[in-house]
Amino acid sequence: TIMGPDETASVFVGSGQTLVLGAAAHKLVVQADPQDSSRVALGVNIAGQVTPLDTQAIGDGLIGGLMRFQDQDLADARNRLGQLAAGLASAVNQQQSYGLDLQGQPGTPLFSFTGPQALPASGNARDASGNPVASVTLAITDASALKASDYRLAPDPANAGQYVITRLADGQVFQPVADGQSVDGFSITIGPNAPAAGESFTLKPVAAAASNLQLVLNNPRGLAAANPVVAVANPANTGTATISALDISAAPADPYQAMTLAFTDDAGSYELRDAGSNLLASGSFSAGQPISYNGIALSLAGLPKTGDRITVEPTTHPAASNGNALRFDNLASRPLVDGQTVADAYANAMSDLGVRVQGAAASADNSATVASRATAELSAETGVNLDEEAARLIQYQQGYQAAAKMLQTAQTMFDAIVNLGR
């Protein structure tokens, strides 16, 4: 706000846009953000033309605080919680798919959540129905690598058919990015009509994940607590090898397939065959290294001998197995959220929220002080001091009385002059 020499005030906002100049006033309007349709933006309507405001330049105060809350605090909190929800739900659903439920069926997902979204900018070309011509779809490829951030995608001016992706949280630029490529745990697929020069999309991998997280498995009998297979050593084995662990690292392609692991020499060479004696895999056992096939990792302690056998067969009594349930418990110590455990990620999110709340409280106090000072200055310029006005009234009264006395004296003198002429 600038006071003019004629006591008029001119009001400017943002990076210099005019709200009030002399007798002219322009309206502050709220509109959809041109880059992100899920947010609102401010603009100044001058003669019917809306000029966007740079919210970073608005400063403090009620409007600045609300815009920062939307653009920074709320967006960051939503992304942090979405990152946490997507990482946890994806890991639980994946582990659920590795096991068998009480009916002996592979586990179905426990949770559902809204996946990544790509929002077109308002300036992108649209068809006659108002739908964007270009389209972009996203898919999660590694939930544990997802970042708590939105992204901006635009055509790469230096590489035709490729794109520039900017991570908005820290400004990290990925260039060039090809159709189908993965960035930070999600992949980008360009539709049949690619974005043209000047068009852009706001990518939101995790923003909606927490708000739409739902439990979709309501029957406890559907919890896949059992391992799909069990490993049994042949009682006639002569070596010292024993089964130390049977881990499931992926959903088995055929969880009901029986396999036999046979060692062909004392050096640890082995063959893995199915029930029909067809060779599935072969290799050499190394102490401390699991033997892996079809999503199954078998770890042994000790040394096998020639002719030793271990059979891996389907679980016949799922109700008596808790192997996969134990791995659900192990999820608590795994880095499921961008290198952090779920507990650490939640603690960091709450810590960041606390810092922001304290910063907002301090900013509010500072703004209140500035507002109080501005109010005092305004009162000093435009307010009424009763003592001063009373003194002025007395002065005016005395001046009036003196003027009246002068008029009375002049009237007397005039009358005297008239009488002399008679």
Predicted regions and their residues:
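S/T-rich, low-complexity, solvent-exposed segments of bacterial secretion/appendage proteins
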Residues: 1-422
